[in-house]
Amino acid sequence: MASFVIEGGHRLSGEIHPQGAKNEVLQIICATLLTAEEVTVNNIPDILDVNNLIQLMRDMGVTVAKTGVDSYSFKAANVDLAYLESDNFLKKCSSLRGSVMLIGPMVARFGKAMISKPGGDKIGRRRLDTHFIGIQNLGADFTYNEEREIYEISAEELKGTSMLLDEASVTGTANIVMAAVLAKGKTTIYNAACEPYLQQLCKMLNRMGAKISGIASNLLTIEGVEELHGTDHTVLPDMIEVGSFIGMAAMTRSEITIKNVSYENLGIIPESFRRLGIKLEQRGDDIFVPAQDCYQIESFIDGSIMTIADAPWPGLTPDLLSVMLVVATQAKGSVLIHQKMFESRLFFVDKLIDMGAQIILCDPHRAVVIGHNHGFTLRGGNMTSPDIRAGIALLIAAMSAEGISRIHNIEQIDRGYQNIEGRLNAIGARITRI
């Protein structure tokens, strides 16, 4: 188990580029299974979850070639269907949550799929019902093999239908869309997720020959086609990294420029940080964050305490609440952080309290943060990263703290952040991997 040793108290300065979006690229790679032709994907981040999925594709018989620094080509002309029933395949799926998005493409093109319960962050219950019910509505049969603890999915023919999703699940919508593009007839999906990464998937599928309309809305209409073809696709910058860097600059009172952020796809993320009192400027497609000695949390118009809560797009992504919580510890004022979508993502706050933060954990979903206004510097400490997003929040806290901190289990951070210590050290951080 690797660790970071962080020497806190150093200001950052310079430019930093966000990596390609993890949550987009996992969908895009799975979608390459929908055609026997070559698909080239650019701006792929070099992170653990993505690399594991790429290796899984190779193991499945997909021809994968690295064509550039961050570019890969995928050609799924000779998929090994027998391998999909092997214990090795199922074991790998169990450690990678993104593997659930293999179901839609596999059932659509090959008529069957097998998958174990996928892994990923331990951040609470993450239901698969939306995936399964949606694909069942298209005509697939699902069975659970208790002996092997796997899901078996099969379909002689998928047929278009109308469905209303019980939740606007991003991965659930992606899975259903990937199945529906090769189904016979028309499919309509109401209460579909509409975040930028899902829009990117739909646009790529249309370039491959799919017929999807309603992109960027919560009502998608899909006319099934006989086959899809190859294409090129470029992944968006990771909005979670962009938000993490904004928070990092505020906590360390640093001046940085975040380059090529695809500002129009950030939604309310910039405004949410402004509510915490953080100044930032859009400069073309870059974000400039000036150094601030203090930042004051806004109140609501009636004077009540500010609440920052997550919601399905175009609401605030839940992946940034951990960052906003830690940033609030050094703000002037108080804020209620309300994590609605997952019930155990706030359970890392005890580590921040040990560092000197003033936080009241109300319940598994809510925490009140009383900011120090930089009047009291957090203390360095020893901590373990429980998941990707808590890990980066703890790293931000350690970078602003007085003294030395150690973060263990940084493999969690590596799952979502590419060479994070190298990129941060290049602009003034002091982080050592041991």
From Swiss-Prot:
Annotated coiled-coil positions are none
**Record's catalysed reaction(s):** phosphoenolpyruvate + UDP-N-acetyl-alpha-D-glucosamine = UDP-N-acetyl-3-O-(1-carboxyvinyl)-alpha-D-glucosamine + phosphate
Q: What is its EC number?
A: 2.5.1.7
Source organism, top-level taxon: Bacteria
Annotated positions binding UDP-N-acetyl-alpha-D-glucosamine: 97, 319, 341
Q: What are the GO BP annotations of this UniProt entry?
A: cell division; cell wall organization; peptidoglycan biosynthetic process; regulation of cell shape; UDP-N-acetylgalactosamine biosynthetic process
The pathway to which it is assigned is:
Cell wall biogenesis; peptidoglycan biosynthesis
- GO CC annotations, alphabetized: cytoplasm
Which protein is depicted?
A: UDP-N-acetylglucosamine 1-carboxyvinyltransferase
